[in-house]
Amino acid sequence: MPAVACYVDTSAAVYGGAGALSLPASEINFSGVPPTTTSTTVNQPPPPQQWSPSLSAELYRIDRWGPPYFAVNSSGNVTVKPFGDATLPHQEIDLLKVVKKVSDSKSSSGLGLHLPVIIRFPDVLKHRLESLQSAFDFAVRTHGYGSHYQGVYPVKCNQDRYIVEDIVEFGSGFRFGLEAGSKPELLMAMSSLCKGSPDSLLVCNGFKDAEYISLAIIGRKLGLNTVIVIEQEEEVDMAIELSRKMGIRPVVGVRAKLRTKHSGHFGSTSGEKGKFGLTTTQILRVVRKLENFGMLDCLQLLHFHIGSQIPTTTLLSDGVAEASQVYCELTRLGAHMRVIDIGGGLGIDYDGSKSGDSDLSVGYTLEEYASAVVGTVMSVCDRKGVKSPVICSESVRAIVSHHSILVFEAVSSSSSASPPMPGSTLALDYLVDGLTDEVKGEYRSLTAAAMRGEYESCLMYSGMLKQRCVELFKDGCLGMEQLAAVDGLCELVSKALGVADGVCTYNVNLSVFTSIPDFWGIGQLFPIMPIHRLDQQPKARGILSDLTCDSDGKIDKFIGDESSLPLHELSGGEGYYLGMFLGGAYEEALGGVHNLFGGPSVVRVQQSDGPQSYAVTRAVPGPSSSDVLRVMHHEPELMFQTLKHRAEECDNDYTAGPLADMLAQSFNSTPYLVPGHATGSCGFSNGSGLVNGCREYFYGVDDGCNAAAVDAAAGEEEQWSYVCA
């Protein structure tokens, strides 16, 4: 069933003489308030408070989940603070201005990209990385810890080239590394770290075959600090055999299955029955095998993972303490242990509740997390007389979630409480004339109850009237116009009595399955809110329905335990833009092509000293219809030629040329809806009517912004622009 809801809007047309279905206000009181019989003084409610951006910030909770990167400015727009609390007022970036720059046509000095769009802020990414490092550095100094922190970024959460390259560049000063979980990810990480610090860790996780392990060993030959983490016992046999054949001594680690278990959704793979890692018995067998081959000195790292979004430092400390005991025991057994990798788990506050009782939040700060880890490892190792290890973490959500914003447009809305059609008693006469005597009785009972002010009876008779009329329609005894009229009357009753469902459906130019797959898959909630008009009070509540032909393609749960979202009424001719925040981890990597909706356009925005305070340093248009067809092994060129040939054969009012042009335009255009009349597309024409490779990069700069910022971001790459067909 299509997820884009279709409603019978009784205000849209007058049905064949049905006229209106509003009861005369002078005769029947549907106000929901019994008429007063005595003269009393009624206290008037206080005048409504004037709406302000600060009230919107409270309403959408951005003042809780947004700091230090997101806020609402005095213009009523969401603003981005690229440097967190250190951002100066003139450095803040107005998100609406960025969206306008990206989506406006090139003739209007825009980039001409279609929404939805992912806007990435590398300044925020850098600040997150530096904040994580600073938190651990502070904990190391405070506790007097005998080693240091050295993190890695698991590329599985977002393998985008520019995110990975940014992290390597931003983190090279403190030896920040990468983690891979497959052969393609390992190849990517090896290539990327050639530009990083030689001391950066390259942690090789996941299930492995001989080729995977060989690649990791080759990495050490190339001067990369690769560590093969043994997750299955047979992997150590391959590592021993291959390293001996290649004449290269590897560095290996073991992943331990801890007894400490995270009870939330994200801890489902933790504990003794977890998907990954080795039991205590298996770890001992790995140690013996390495010892038998004189390679126990190669065992240098212990890895574990309690689960993502660890809710409290109490649970964190329990897991780290258990793992630290394992680390100390491995040292006692003769391994040359050097690194303890605590995995992921550093959570973020999706709903602003700062609660340790929810999968959507955590009950600690970044500094408290780092202090708990460092203090616990130090306590166990000092007690056992073991040298403090390098502490590594794979804190992916905390690194990348904030730097990426998905912006999409609400293209229409459908209210379940439509206004009545104009008219009066003629419509009622038309309706009554078409009813059976039994149903006329229900109608008379309804009007009588309304006259007496018996409002519960009104609802009962209204429901009975509607049910009887539906039965008549199914039997072919009632016309569609009359059925619509009955719906309008019953809707009017519900609205007048204040019991009508006031939740609207806002149809959005988006695919939930492509852009927010975690919502569909596991019910993960992200902050969603309008990015503008926040100086105006939202008068509606709505759910969001996407473009896909799937009933699951909707967003009907929101942070704050809400089943609808406060929204503004749509204004004709003006776009209404919504943003999904804190979705920089996993969503792009997990998204599919359901209904052949491809990924959004992507732009990279950096802070600039120009008057607009930002510069668009990279833009990638979203895939065209041809692009997503190729993903499913179709050949758009052959499809186009087939349809073009059919057009030439058909005898119709159109010539073959215009038909072919229209077909080519459809292949080249975005799979998403295009506002207005423009259906242009991005790419380079090959002369056959189709566009090849709509994936080139655009380096642009806002009017008045510092062009040097763009040149620096472009580096040594050739600068491209794209054309719109």
From Swiss-Prot:
Entry binding sites for substrate: I340, D341, I342, G343, G344, G345, L346, G347, I348, D349, Y350
Q: Which UniProt keywords apply?
A: Decarboxylase, Lyase, Magnesium, Putrescine biosynthesis, Pyridoxal phosphate, Spermidine biosynthesis
Q: Looking at the record's lineage, which domain of life comes first?
A: Eukaryota
Q: One GO MF term, please? A: arginine decarboxylase activity
The PTM N6-(pyridoxal phosphate)lysine maps to K156
Catalytic function, reaction form: L-arginine + H(+) = agmatine + CO2
GO aspect biological process, one term: spermidine biosynthetic process
Coiled-coil parts of chain: none
Q: What is its EC number?
A: 4.1.1.19
Keyword S-adenosyl-L-methionine listed = no
**One Pfam family of this protein, by short name?**
Orn_Arg_deC_N
Keyword NADP (UniProt): no
This protein's pathway reads: Amine and polyamine biosynthesis; agmatine biosynthesis; agmatine from L-arginine: step 1/1
Task: Report the enzyme's class at the first EC level.
Answer: lyase
Cofactor dependency: pyridoxal 5'-phosphate; Mg(2+)
Which family does the entry's similarity section mention? Belongs to the Orn/Lys/Arg decarboxylase class-II family. SpeA subfamily.
- The protein depicted here goes by the name Arginine decarboxylase
Source lineage:
Eukaryota, Viridiplantae, Streptophyta, Embryophyta, Tracheophyta
